[in-house]
C-alpha cells in the first residue's frame, strides 16, 4: 500500500481533510438523519396527543410498548447521523477560514441538537419499558408521555441556533451554498413557532439537512470538474 509522501506533510501531522471527504460525510449524515428520523416516526406509528386521558394511555402502551421503544432506538441513531452532518459543516467552515466564533457556534448548536434528540429517544425508550409493566401509575405514565409527545423549547431552540449558524456560514463565510443559507433563515424562525407550524418546520428541517448534505457532496464535485476542465483548456490553448 502506498504511503503518504513525508514532504507533503512536513510537520508529521495528520493529512488535512479533503473537500471530497467532507462532502461524503455531510451526505451520509444529512440523508441518514432524514431517513432515521422518518423511520422512527413510522416505527412508532400513530401517537396519542399530550391531552390523551391516562386510562387510554395505559391501554395504548400495553399494546404498543415494543414499537415505541424500538422507535426511540431508531431516533437515537438519527442523532448520531446529525452529529456526522454537523462535523462535516464544521470542517467546511474551518476550511473556508471563517471566524472561529462561527465554527464554534456550529459545533455548539450541533451538540445541543444531538443531545435533545437523544433525550427524546431516551424518553421513548422509557415509555417502551414501563408500558410493558403491570400496575404502572397512570399519572406517572401520562407525565412521561407528555414529555415524549410534546416538543420542548430546547428542541426548537437548538435547531434554531443550528440553522442560524448555517445562515452565517453561507452568507458571511461563503462556506455553504448561498441557497442553503437563505433558506435556513426563515426555517430557523419557523422553528420557534408553536403548534402545527412548528411541527411542519421540524419536518422541513429534516429535508433541508438531507438536501444540504447532497449539495455539499455534488456541489464540490461540480466545482472540481469545472476547475479541471478550465486547466485542460488552458493547456490546449498554450500548446
What are these regions (language model features)?
Residues 2-239:
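Hydrophobic, aromatic-enriched alpha-helical segments typical of multi-pass transmembrane helices
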Amino acid at each position: 500500500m502506498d504511503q503518504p509522501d513525508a514532504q507533503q506533510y512536513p510537520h508529521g501531522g495528520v493529512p488535512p481533510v479533503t473537500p471530497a471527504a467532507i462532502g461524503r460525510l455531510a451526505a451520509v449524515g444529512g440523508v441518514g438523519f432524514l431517513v432515521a428520523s422518518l423511520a422512527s416516526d413510522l416505527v412508532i406509528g400513530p401517537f396519542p396527543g399530550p391531552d390523551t386521558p391516562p386510562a387510554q394511555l395505559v391501554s395504548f402502551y400495553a399494546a404498543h410498548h415494543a414499537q415505541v421503544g424500538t422507535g426511540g432506538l431508531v431516533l437515537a441513531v438519527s442523532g448520531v447521523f446529525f452529529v456526522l452532518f454537523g462535523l462535516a459543516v464544521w470542517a467546511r467552515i474551518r476550511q473556508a477560514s471563517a471566524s472561529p466564533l462561527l465554527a464554534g457556534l456550529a459545533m455548539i448548536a450541533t451538540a445541543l441538537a444531538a443531545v435533545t434528540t437523544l433525550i427524546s429517544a431516551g424518553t421513548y425508550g422509557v415509555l417502551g419499558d414501563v408500558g410493558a409493566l403491570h400496575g404502572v401509575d397512570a399519572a406517572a405514565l401520562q407525565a412521561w408521555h407528555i414529555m415524549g409527545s410534546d416538543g420542548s423549547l430546547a428542541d426548537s431552540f437548538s435547531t434554531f441556533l443550528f440553522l442560524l449558524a448555517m445562515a452565517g456560514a453561507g452568507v458571511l463565510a461563503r462556506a455553504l451554498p448561498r441557497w442553503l443559507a437563505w433558506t435556513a433563515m426563515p426555517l430557523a424562525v419557523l422553528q420557534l413557532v408553536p403548534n402545527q407550524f412548528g411541527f411542519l418546520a421540524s419536518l422541513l428541517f429534516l429535508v433541508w439537512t438531507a438536501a444540504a448534505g447532497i449539495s455539499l457532496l455534488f456541489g464540490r464535485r461540480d466545482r472540481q470538474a469545472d476547475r479541471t476542465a478550465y486547466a485542460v483548456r488552458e493547456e490546449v490553448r498554450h500548446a
